[in-house]
From Swiss-Prot:
Gene this chain is encoded by: FMC1
Main localization of the protein described in the UniProt heading: mitochondrion
Species name: Bos taurus (Bovine)
GO cellular component: mitochondrion
Name the record gives this protein: Protein FMC1 homolog
Chain intervals for the UniProt region annotation (Disordered): 93-113
Record keywords, A-Z: Mitochondrion
Family statement: Belongs to the FMC1 family.
Subunit structure: Interacts with ATPAF2.
InterPro entries reported in the protein's UniProt record: FMC1_homologue
């Protein structure tokens, strides 16, 4: 994992992923146990002065790791839905998956298939 960034950015990313998870259920993300736990943990490890706090850095690292997990799961599900085998595909669909287009069949007067 690269540099952690700011705790606020990690916090916002976690909230965004919670919103994505709860969009399917229709429930507000603030009603979940995960949200309440994150709020409680971030408030408990908030530092008001510039002292070095190991617990805050550990919390930030764990939160960033959890954010990476949630984001990876969401992207995996999206890729799985897009590319999962749905039986036999047509030639046009297979070409479209890799970004190609089939040439158009010539038509008009005198053309016989």
């Amino acid at each position: 994992m690269a540099a952690l960034g700011s705790p606020l950015r990690t916090w916002r990313g976690l909230l965004r992923e919670l919103r994505y998870l709860n969009a399917a259920t229709g429930r507000p993300y603030r009603d979940t146990a995960a949200y309440r736990y994150l709020v409680k943990a971030f408030r408990a490890h908030r530092v008001t002065s510039e002292k070095l706090c190991r617990a805050q850095h550990e919390l930030h690292f764990q939160a960033a790791t959890y954010l990476c997990l949630l984001r990876s799961i969401r992207e995996h599900v999206a890729l799985h839905q897009e590319f999962h085998g749905k039986g036999e595909r047509s030639v046009e669909e297979s070409a479209g998956l890799v970004g190609l287009k089939l040439p158009q069949q010539p038509g008009g007067k005198g053309w016989e298939p």
